[in-house]
Amino acid sequence: RLITDYSQMLKDEASLSREKMSKINLIEIINSVVEDFKQDLINQNKKIDIIVVDKIDSNNGYYIFGISNRLEQVIANLLDNSISFSQNTQTIEITLGETSNNVLMTIKDEGPGFSETSPQKIFKRFYSNRPKNFGKHSGLGLNIVKNIVELHKGTITASNRLNIKGAKVEVLLPKYS
């Protein structure tokens, strides 16, 4: 599996720079990905809250310049991790807001959080710190996520939530202008 995952990652990285970017409404992408997880959430008695804050432009969205299917991949991977580490009945929160030049997407869960002293390690290639009962993982998923975010001229950071158990991942992407 590791060789297959690594091979696919290299192909994806090579094709990323050739894919066409376009104006994308990030709210629509998030809603689409959350819809894809709906049955899993029902089966596990978990829920996702989507919170849209700040001013939304006149076209009713937060727009960025990007590759739609790659941004879906980013959101799906981050949600999949949050769902995996959350217990039944826990809530995952996606918050979408803005700064003067960027769109900020924050995903928070109520799982155990990061055991690493430096949570940024999770974005390193081949790094995995999942418990054995989670099955085998290649440690490539979050590295791919980071590469996609950086291709979009964005940043991604991970931290533990303050004063509450859980993880927080923030993705900052430039607004479409």
Where do the protein language model's features map onto the residues?
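Conserved micro-motifs of the catalytic ATP-binding
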Residues: 14-19, 59-66
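A conserved beta-strand-to-alpha-helix junction within the catalytic ATP-binding
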Residues: 20-38, 54
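Short conserved segments within the C-terminal catalytic ATPase subdomain
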Residues: 40-55
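Short helix-loop "hinge" at the ATP-lid/N-box region of the Bergerat-fold HATPase_c
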Residues: 82-83
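Short beta-strand/loop element within the Bergerat-fold HATPase_c
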Residues: 89-101
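Short conserved segment of the HATPase_c
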Residues: 114-126
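Conserved glycine-rich
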Residues: 154-155
